[in-house]
Amino acid sequence: MNRNLWIKGTSLALGCALYVLSGCTTTDRTAARLPIAITSNGVNAVSVWDEIAANTINLPPAATGTANEKQPHYALDMATVHIAIYDAVIAIAGTHKPFAVTPTMPVAGASMDAAASAAAYGVLKGLFPARSNVYQAAYDSRLDAIPASEAKSRGVALGSEVARGVLAMRARDGRDTVLAPYMPGTTPGKFRGINPAFRFMVSVKPFTLTDGAQFRAGGPPAIGAPAYANDFNEAKALGSVASTLRSAAQTEVARFHSEPPNRFWTRNLHQFASSQSQSADNARLMASIWVAHADATIACFDSKYHFDFWRPTSAIQMAEPTQNPATLADAHWQPIIPTPNHPEYPAAHSCVTSATAHTIRRFFGTNQVSFKFASAVPGTVVHSFVTTDDLVNEIQAARIHGGMHFRTATTDGAVIGEKVARWVMERHFQKRN
C-alpha cells in the first residue's frame, strides 16, 4: 500500500496535467512551473556509477580493513564521487561551470561515458583502495563496452585527471583529526552520551560553506522557557514506546525513517540519477544534491556539538520541577525508536532532508516534484511525496513521534538545510556565461 501525501490548494497551469520529465528542457519546465514526476530515462553513466559508489561506500568497514583509508561517511564520499563525475561530464558538455577541476587536456570529442567512468573509478580507488572488489570489475566491464577510439582514450584521460584533482581538493578534509576524549554532560540540558558519534564532523572542511559554523543554529529553548515545556511534553506524549496518543500511521512514519541514513539515502536518491534525458543534467543534479547533503551534515554537527543539548530520554527521565514546573519527570520513559548517540539539537535528519529537498526544488524551479521513497525497516510501506515540502514535513514528524527529538530541533534543522541548499545552488553548478 502506498502512502500519498497531497497538499491542499495545489493549482495547475491551465491545460496542464501531470508532467513527466522526458521531452522537455529544464528551462521550459521552470518557466511553466509544471508538476514533475520523477521517472527513469534509462541507465546512464551517472546512474551506473551512483550505484557502484553507494555499494562501495556502504560496505561495512570491518569487511575491508580500512586502517589505511579515511573514516568513511556516505555523504562526504558520495559528494566527492559526484563532483568528479560532474566536472568530467560538464567539461565535455560545456554547458556549466566546473565545481573543482578544469581539465588541462583537450576535451573535444571525448567520450562522456568513458570520462564519467574514469572520474568515478579514480575517486573510489583513491578513497577505498581495499574495496576494489566492488568497483574494479564494474569499471573494466564499462570500459570494455566502449569501442577503442580516440574518443575513449580522451575520455579516460580526462576523467582520470579530474579524479586526481578532486582527490587533491579533499585530501586534507579534516575527518581524520585526532579528537580529545569526550566528557559527558552533568548539568541540566547537557548531552549525556558516552563516546558520541560523528564528532569528527566538527573538524571537516565543507565543500562550499566558509566553515561549519556559517549557518549555526540559534540554539534550543532555555529549559525554563514555555517553549521548552511544549517541546518536552509533546515528545513525552507522542514519542514514548508506551504512548497511547501516537497513531499507527505516525508509528509507521517514525519507523520508516529509522533506517540507517547511509543506505536509506543512497538507495532512494538513486532514482534521480536517471531522471534526466541528458547525462550532463543527471550529473549536475546528483552533484548538487550530494554536495548540499554533505555540507548540511557538516553544518548540522557543528551546531550539535556547539550546543551539546540533551535528548528527550535524558530530559524526561531527569526533569526537575525547579528547572521548569511544566515538565514532569518519568524515570522509566523510553522512546519507541532507539536514540542516536549524538546531541539532540538540531535534528540531523531535518538538516539533510531539507537540504536535499530544497536542492531538488531549486534544480527544477518548483516544489511540485513527486517521487517515492522506500525503507528497509520491516513493516513499513512505500511513501509517495507530491512535493518536496511533504518530505521535509514528514521527517520532522518522524523524529518527534520516534521520541528522538524535540520539535524545535526539527524546525531549526530544516532551516539549516534550506540555507545550505540556497548557498550551494546560488554559487555553484551555474551555467557558463
Identify the function of each model-found stretch:
Residues 10-14, 28:
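Short, intrinsically disordered, low-complexity terminal segments
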Residues 28-433:
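Acidic/polar surface patches and capping/hinge elements
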